[in-house]
Amino acid sequence: MKILIAISSKKYSSQTLEVGMRVAKAFNAKPTIVDVGDKINQFSLKEVGVAQERMESWDLDRPGVEVLEWAFDFLSENKFIEKKEIESGFPKNTLIETGGRRSEVYLKGTVCDDVSLILRNGEIIEELISEVQKEHYDVTIIGKSQSSKKDYELSQYIDSSIFIVNNYQLDRNYKILLAIHESHF
């Protein structure tokens, strides 16, 4: 089973990441954590490439990397990745471009074989739908949108089961009703 966990920041996504990793552990699933950053204008792609090269030489991070670094720290603190990965620190220099708007870093997990951290740029709904279609995730875990209906919109168009985290409290026990169809679960 493959699970996509969509995050946006420490402030708004800590509950989503916590629940997502607990679900991945419970189902022995392969978790992928994704952050969707702002869309890069097509006219400025060349300038962005030059800026990224300069940022690397100046040891500055590209936008969105700090969210992935926070997710790495969370995975480290909760021992979801191997000790060797933790000791090496966040591998921002091994962020691999896997498409025009998609970069990925692979980590060796303790819950399952691999944990992936992905940074995408663009409109959040479009990018998450594209990610699910391309990688064939079984479940997408997102946080409840506070100010918009993006969670509702995503639930209408995404081609996977969806789990929306809303006001999760660590000290409570929850029951989850899993509605399934005739898929390979």
Please place each PLM-identified region on the residue numbering.
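Structural beta-alpha unit
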Residues: D73-T140
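Short secondary-structure capping/turn micro-motifs that flank functional sites
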Residues: I40-N41, P91-K92, S148
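Gly/Ser-rich helix-loop-strand patches that form or flank binding pockets
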Residues: K11, L17-V19, L117-K175
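Well-ordered, non-membrane alpha-helical segments in soluble/globular domains
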Residues: D61-L68, G99-G100
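Small/aliphatic-rich secondary-structure junction motif
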Residues: M1-D61, S76, K83, Y157, ...
